[in-house]
């Protein structure tokens, strides 16, 4: 990309708009940091004190000890379950992410026993499964740091019986091991009931003496079922499983020892294959990423040139734009991020037929050349109206949606503003299986905006009343609309979305480049498949 033109910023740092944008974004980021700090504490001071009193490392200290010194950790869904379960499950009681262990990128899943004993709420299951999905798609070894009491029994109907519930964790382990994706477990505490299958179905397993326990039925269940009285250590401790049952392969003296053993295991894994694309030395953007706060309006309804974002994310701020004069409400082009080649698809307004055709064409190009795609989403949807329907906007939009769905290259999505309606589909929303998807704190996501939804439903009701010869006073209509607006505002919020794992996390806009770079490095572990496009309606 060294020959690509260098983007320059037209934003004015001295302007009132810049100052207002910056102030708004800083307030949003401050809120984000507060939420993240609270989630990182886990189950609270007393729970942490009990945990460490038993000689255990805290869950995040376990992850830090496992990782290569000084290496980054790309955490997944750190605010899962935010505001759910009466605030009793910060981060859904599990830490998940991608980190480097003995030089290899691995997916790490660490139970947080300070949160309800590490039991699995519905969102805990969803987060664990999401981490496994990331491992499968990117062919990353899995390391499970187990310290869990199993399913959260009061919500068993939302945790146990269905396809994407607790049992899917072990199904995934079996399938990934069969596909040559290593599965490694360290039992650092309880490993109860179905959870016992995590180490039992791993390629290699470590257990800590006098601390780790594995059993399908714990001492209370054994006593109730058989009358036998037995301690947890006698039933399923480290000595039993390392010397007698053979469920585990390594016996450690403490957490630190267990994590050293895991690092040794990872160091014995075969080297990964060649990279699927060329990676060159990274170059910092010429435009300062800190300028994202001022250059980008916090309100997604305010128009701006998305090249202001691209300039602050890509290497050297260099961007080889594709079809710059056609379909100008969609910006497409080639760049590099941390040395990785990328094709960027970025909203610059509402989607018309021309911009949808341009997007489909560009995605096909990237697929043909084996270049990962980065989607920068800020979209209110497709243009509507009689002329546009007659012009075939449905079939043109379908071309772009088909291209997004069928491309074989990794797709990374960043929601930097609004994500509404069919625009979400064309710009690789969660339903289109991006390898990763993040949101900025100002992002909004819903089938349409709250005002539009309220107006649509009010129009339907007004038509019904008029058909019966009844009137509808303005004040009654306003009262009807108000709760609809409030519902959409609440449910479209970035934190409502991330709590339910509709994304992989809410991030500081300034971290966009770093997050994308780490994700691209993870994606480079998996080979590209074969092109496989469906029918494009002409």
Write out the residue ranges for each language-model feature.
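Ligand-binding clefts of soluble mixed alpha/beta catalytic domains
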Residues: 1-538
């Amino acid at each position: 990309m060294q020959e690509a033109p260098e983007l320059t910023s037209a934003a004015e740092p001295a302007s009132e708009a810049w100052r207002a944008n910056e102030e708004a974004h800083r307030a949003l980021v401050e809120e984000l940091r507060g939420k993240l700090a609270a989630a990182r504490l886990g189950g609270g001071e007393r729970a942490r004190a009990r945990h460490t009193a038993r000689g255990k490392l805290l869950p995040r200290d376990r992850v830090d000890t496992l990782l290569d010194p000084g290496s980054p950790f790309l955490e997944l869904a750190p605010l899962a379950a935010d505001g759910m379960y009466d605030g009793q499950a910060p981060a859904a009681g599990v830490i998940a992410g991608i980190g480097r262990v003995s030089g290899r990128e691995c997916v790490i899943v660490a139970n947080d026993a300070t949160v309800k004993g590490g039991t699995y709420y519905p969102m805990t299951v969803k987060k664990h499964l999401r981490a496994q999905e990331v491992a499968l798609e990117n062919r990353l070894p899995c390391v499970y740091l187990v310290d869990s009491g199993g399913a959260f029994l009061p919500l068993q109907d939302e945790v146990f019986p269905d396809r994407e519930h607790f049992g899917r964790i072990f199904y995934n382990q079996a399938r990934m091991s069969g596909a040559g994706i290593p599965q490694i477990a360290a039992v650092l505490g309880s490993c109860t009931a179905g959870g016992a299958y995590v180490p039992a179905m791993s390629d290699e397993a470590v257990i800590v003496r006098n601390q780790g326990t594995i059993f399908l039925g714990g001492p209370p269940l054994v006593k109730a079922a058989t009358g036998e009285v037995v301690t947890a250590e006698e039933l399923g401790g480290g000595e039993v499983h390392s010397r007698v049952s053979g469920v585990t392969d390594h016996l450690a003296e403490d957490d630190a020892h267990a994590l050293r053993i895991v690092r040794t295991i990872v160091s014995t894994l075969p080297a990964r294959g060649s990279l699927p694309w060329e990676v060159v030395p990274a170059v910092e953007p010429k435009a300062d990423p800190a300028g994202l706060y001022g250059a980008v309006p916090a309100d997604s309804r305010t128009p701006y040139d998305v090249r202001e974002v691209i300039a602050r994310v890509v290497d050297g701020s260099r961007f080889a734009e594709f079809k710059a004069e056609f379909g100008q409400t969609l910006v497409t082009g080639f760049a590099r991020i941390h040395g990785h080649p990328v094709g960027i698809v970025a909203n610059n307004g509402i989607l018309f037929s021309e911009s949808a055709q341009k997007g489909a064409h560009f995605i096909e190009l990237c697929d043909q050349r084996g270049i990962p795609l980065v989607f920068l989403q800020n979209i209110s949807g497709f243009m509507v109206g009689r002329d546009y329907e007659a012009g075939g906007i449905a079939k043109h939009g379908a071309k772009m949606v088909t291209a997004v769905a069928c491309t074989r290259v990794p797709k990374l999505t960043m929601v930097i503003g609004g994500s509404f309606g069919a625009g979400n589909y064309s710009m690789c929303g969660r339903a289109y299986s991006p390898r990763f998807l993040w949101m900025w704190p100002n992002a909004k996501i819903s089938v349409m905006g709250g005002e539009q939804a309220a107006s649509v439903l009010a129009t339907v009701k007004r038509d019904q009343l008029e058909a019966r010869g009844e009137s509808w006073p303005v004040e009654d209509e306003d009262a009807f609309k108000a709760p609809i607006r409030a519902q959409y505002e609440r449910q479209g919020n970035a934190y409502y979305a991330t709590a339910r794992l509709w994304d992989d996390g809410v991030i500081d806009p300034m971290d966009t480049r770093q997050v994308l770079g780490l994700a691209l490095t993870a994606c480079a572990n998996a080979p590209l498949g074969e092109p496989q496009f469906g029918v494009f309606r002409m």
